[in-house]
Amino acid sequence: MAAFTGTTDKCKACDKTVYVMDLMTLEGMPYHKSCFRCSHCNGTLVICNYSSMDGVLYCKTHFEQLFKESGNFSKNFQTAGKTEKSNDATKAPNRLSSFFSGTQDKCAACKKTVYPLEKMTMEGESYHKTCFRCAHSGCPLTHSSYAALDGVLYCKVHFSQLFLEKGNYNHVLQAAANHRRSTAEEDKTEPKEDEANPTEEETSDAAAEEHES
């Protein structure tokens, strides 16, 4: 039941309390799903077409216009407070560099590296935007059509079937456990680089033994 209780988190956009069923976390910031909008045009965003800078959300069209096409990041950079000290402007290139650089974060769905432009954080896990899918059916999710339990994502239809209609946590928790187990088994079947490719030392030792024989 704890998953449905209120929180003290405040929405980054409207500054009102965010409850768990309406919560989405992006770039470490809590939002209402309904507040997931471009800060420039106020257009509704979906998971597969948003970009962000320091927690401020944009549609890809305006992100391109403001950051890529203009070539002036400090001028167009919008912060939550809309004001920065002059010496902070010199840090913009560093922010930009870290924004576009690689990370060590792994996608919870495919286990591959997630780069910032394709990264979203939901329920404490990092995902590629294209990997944001229902764990039960694999159908694509949007910010307004997902539900989660124990960090596993579902479309609302299957979450309803597995949890709300049956009124049984065990059923949906079992589905989550099966999902994690299948992911772990897939990881085990992938050969490790050290096992698949012998080192130069191992190759030279084998050649020496063959020569001696």
Swiss-Prot record:
Name of a matching Pfam family: LIM
Region (Disordered): 177-213
Expression (tissue specificity): Exclusively expressed in pollen grains.
Keyword DNA repair tagged: no
Basic and acidic residues: compositionally biased ranges: 182-195
Family annotation (CDD domains): LIM1_SF3
Gene Ontology terms, MF aspect: actin filament binding; metal ion binding
Gene Ontology cellular component terms for the protein in this record: cytoplasm; cytoskeleton
PROSITE patterns: LIM_DOMAIN_1 (PS00478), LIM_DOMAIN_2 (PS50023)
Domain comment as written in the entry: The C-terminal domain (159-213) is required for the ability to respond to pH and calcium variations.
InterPro entries: Znf_LIM
Described function: Binds to actin filaments and promotes cross-linking into thick bundles. Has an actin-stabilizing activity. Associates predominantly with long and dynamic actin bundles in the shank of growing pollen tubes. The actin regulatory activities are inhibited by pH > 6.8 and/or high [Ca(2+)].
GO BP annotations listed: actin filament bundle assembly
LIM zinc-binding domain sequence ranges: 9-69, 105-165
Entry protein name: LIM domain-containing protein PLIM2c
Disulfide feature: none
Keyword DNA-binding applies: no
Main localization (coarse): cytoplasm
Miscellaneous: Cross-links actin with a constant of dissociation of 1.5 uM.
Organism: Arabidopsis thaliana
Protein localization: Cytoplasm, Cytoskeleton
PANTHER family with a match to the protein in the record: OS06G0237300 PROTEIN (PTHR24206)
Keywords per UniProt: Actin-binding, Cytoplasm, Cytoskeleton, LIM domain, Metal-binding, Repeat, Zinc
Subunit structure: Interacts with F-actin.
